[in-house]
Amino acid sequence: MTGSIRSSTAGIDVRQLGSVDYQTAWQMQRDLADARVAGGPDTLLLLQHPAVYTAGRRTEPHERPGPVFAGAAGDEAIDVVDTDRGGKITWHGPGQLVGYPIIRLAQPLDVVNYVRRLEESLIKVSLDLGLETRRVEGRSGVWIPAGSGRPERKIAAIGVRVSRATTLHGFALNCDCDLAAFTAIVPCGISDAGVTSLSAELGRTVGVEEVRGAVADAVCNALDGALPVRDHPGARVASST
């Protein structure tokens, strides 16, 4: 999987945003996709969301959470938003870096290739922090393997939609988010695995600000083929010695 997957040779317009409401960001994606189809640039949005659950098209009724509350006083209800992306239900919130590439794919379309490139970019960022991660066959996203009595743990989720050869939605990398938010759901419909974060695995705080520049570079390089997709058969926390 080398060479660019994009139809354009122009650079990607990377927009580093702050905290953006999910519905606002979703409309932003649709507007950017319309603009891209009309000849505008490829764009990568990097941001955080206030706490929200998003349900992909394959979410079953029993997988939706009951009332969940957040906020300092625990009295702010967390919304559940139905989306048009693939996959099932997940959580977004503070401490999680969300990326939305709005990219016109080259022909012939290869959505699996596109997803593998997103995974590769997040595997690269994790490795540069000292954490080896990998793919799991049959499951999208980036994972820590089972070991020491712990199940496989997802550190980054991916859910995309491609319409008019243009991508929407994207990925979510858990940096220093509240992992308890995932306990109200079966994340992505996978009941035999866990969820983790960079901070939890590395034993130190790894905030969104620390990784957002590296994620932007890695995603752009992966989409353009400068970061090739590789096999990652094993994964562990790299030794500091």
From Swiss-Prot:
Q: Quote the pathway field.
A: Protein modification; protein lipoylation via endogenous pathway; protein N(6)-(lipoyl)lysine from octanoyl-[acyl-carrier-protein]: step 1/2
Q: What is this protein called?
A: Octanoyltransferase
Major localization listed first in the record, in broad terms: cytoplasm
Catalysed reactions, as listed in the record: octanoyl-[ACP] + L-lysyl-[protein] = N(6)-octanoyl-L-lysyl-[protein] + holo-[ACP] + H(+)
Other information: In the reaction, the free carboxyl group of octanoic acid is attached via an amide linkage to the epsilon-amino group of a specific lysine residue of lipoyl domains of lipoate-dependent enzymes.
UniProt entry keywords in alphabetical sequence:
Acyltransferase, Cytoplasm, Transferase
Physiological role: Catalyzes the transfer of endogenously produced octanoic acid from octanoyl-acyl-carrier-protein onto the lipoyl domains of lipoate-dependent enzymes. Lipoyl-ACP can also act as a substrate although octanoyl-ACP is likely to be the physiological substrate.
The active site annotation covers: 188
Q: Which residues bind substrate?
A: 85-92, 157-159, 170-172
- Give the protein family: Belongs to the LipB family.
A single GO BP term for this record reads:
protein modification process
What SUPFAM superfamilies does the database record attribute to this sequence?
Class II aaRS and biotin synthetases (SSF55681)
* Lineage start: Bacteria, Bacillati, Actinomycetota, Actinomycetes, Mycobacteriales
Q: BPL/LPL catalytic domain spans which residues?
A: 38-227
Q: Which organism is it from?
A: Mycobacterium ulcerans (strain Agy99)
* Subcellular location as annotated: Cytoplasm
